């Protein structure tokens, strides 16, 4: 069996399946995609000769609806609860030796009850793999990592990935803690966006103390708070009030205005936007900000409709890129802390 495993948000399996199918077609690769709603993952099966190409081109950072992508090695069904280890050992590829082991389960209503089994099974499997020479005694991040994904007590997917090419969190979910002083839980969305959509080097270069930012539709202030934690000076645009600790903060200027109509008096380094509005309208307004040179970098959310979400995603991103009319770095992702939405990062490469 050859192909890919891709984790996603429960309920967005059809969107991920459509994204994978379209991307494979563009690459000229025939694929068989299996997705069931609310299962939290999608399987893509293909000719073994094409797996490496797909893993490279369908990297988790390049996919919008995938939290993690893995090389699929085997699917094991009807496992005996008295001995799950022997069939797993037998199904592993002859090479390589793995440098790490993650025992996982889908982030879904069916998968979450398997968390206890995953923890205990990892403790049992790890020493056996090491004794068999299939797992290094010490962590080796440069070696492939083995993923054992439980779909049920007797149903397992075996996959692998290179640590440097994969999401660095189990299940593809970053574990972020909401600090008590954060004005709202929406702060977690921007925090996750910064660590997911930007590389460490990009964060260091593009989020420097003293930079200027605008937060459109800022109230109650979750995204503004994240920016001032990065020591940026923020102009928060909203007719509604901001919550403490943003009131009278030296890095925050609150302007009571409509975020869709306000124009900055000078170019900004950053603009962020999490307004609840039709996604096409948001995409068009964001494009204006880049086209007019009002900012260099931006992060914004697109609230998706209940139906045809993949079609709407493609349309909005294509319209945004066309109307921005500047050279762009463009990345989009449905984050763990997103709901019926995606988060987009765009940067004007010409400035």
Curated annotation (Swiss-Prot):
S-adenosyl-L-methionine binds at residues 186, 219-222, 238, 258, 274. It catalyses: cytidine(2498) in 23S rRNA + S-adenosyl-L-methionine = 2'-O-methylcytidine(2498) in 23S rRNA + S-adenosyl-L-homocysteine + H(+). It is an enzyme of class 2 (transferase). It is found in: Cytoplasm. The keyword Cytoplasm applies. SUPFAM superfamilies: S-adenosyl-L-methionine-dependent methyltransferases. Its EC number is 2.1.1.186. The active site is at 303 (proton acceptor). InterPro entries: RlmM_FDX (IPR040739), RlmM_THUMP-like (IPR048646), RNA_MeTrfase_FtsJ_dom (IPR002877), rRNA_MeTrfase_M (IPR011224), SAM-dependent_MTases_sf (IPR029063). The keyword Transferase applies. Signal peptide: none annotated. One of its GO terms (biological process) is rRNA processing. Keywords: Cytoplasm, Methyltransferase, rRNA processing, S-adenosyl-L-methionine, Transferase. Pfam families: FtsJ, RlmM_FDX, RLMM_N. Catalyzes the 2'-O-methylation at nucleotide C2498 in 23S rRNA. PANTHER family: RIBOSOMAL RNA LARGE SUBUNIT METHYLTRANSFERASE M, RIBOSOMAL RNA METHYLTRANSFERASE FTSJ DOMAIN-CONTAINING PROTEIN. Monomer. Belongs to the class I-like SAM-binding methyltransferase superfamily. RNA methyltransferase RlmE family. RlmM subfamily. This is Ribosomal RNA large subunit methyltransferase M. It comes from Xylella fastidiosa (strain Temecula1 / ATCC 700964).
């Amino acid at each position: 069996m050859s192909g890919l495993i891709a984790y996603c948000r429960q309920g967005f399996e059809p969107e991920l399946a459509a994204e994978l199918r379209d991307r494979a077609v563009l690459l000229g690769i025939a694929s068989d995609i299996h997705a069931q709603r609310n299962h939290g993952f999608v399987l893509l099966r293909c000719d073994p000769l094409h797996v490496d190409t797909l893993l490279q081109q369908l990297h988790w950072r390049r996919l919008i609806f995938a939290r993690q992508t893995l090389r699929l090695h085997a699917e094991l069904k009807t496992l005996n609860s008295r001995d799950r280890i022997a069939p797993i050992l037998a199904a592993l590829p002859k090479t390589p030796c793995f440098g790490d082991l993650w025992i996982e389960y889908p982030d879904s209503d069916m998968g979450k009850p398997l968390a206890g089994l995953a923890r205990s099974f990892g403790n049992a499997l790890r020493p056996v793999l090491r004794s068999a020479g299939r797992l290094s005694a010490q962590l080796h991040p440069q070696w492939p990592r083995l993923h054992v994904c439980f779909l049920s007590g007797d149903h397992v997917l075996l996959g692998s990935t290179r640590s440097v090419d994969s999401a660095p969190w189990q299940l593809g979910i970053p574990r972020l803690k909401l600090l008590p002083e954060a004005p709202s839980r929406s702060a977690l969305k921007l925090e996750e966006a910064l660590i997911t959509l930007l590389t460490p080097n990009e964060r260091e270069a593009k989020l420097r103390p003293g930079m200027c930012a605008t937060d459109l539709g800022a109230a109650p202030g979750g995204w503004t708070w994240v920016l001032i934690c990065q020591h940026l000076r923020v102009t928060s645009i909203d007719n509604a009030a901001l919550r403490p600790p943003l009131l009278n903060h030296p890095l925050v200027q609150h302007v009571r205005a409509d975020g869709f109509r306000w124009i900055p008096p000078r170019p900004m380094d950053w603009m962020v936007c999490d307004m609840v509005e039709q996604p096409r309208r948001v995409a068009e307004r964001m494009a204006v900000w880049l086209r007019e040179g009002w900012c260099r970098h931006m992060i914004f959310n697109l609230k998706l409709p209940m139906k045809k979400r993949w079609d709407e995603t493609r349309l909005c991103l294509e319209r945004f890129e066309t109307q921005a009319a500047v050279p762009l770095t463009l990345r989009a992702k449905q984050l763990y802390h997103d709901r019926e939405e995606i988060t987009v990062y765009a940067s004007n490469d010409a400035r």
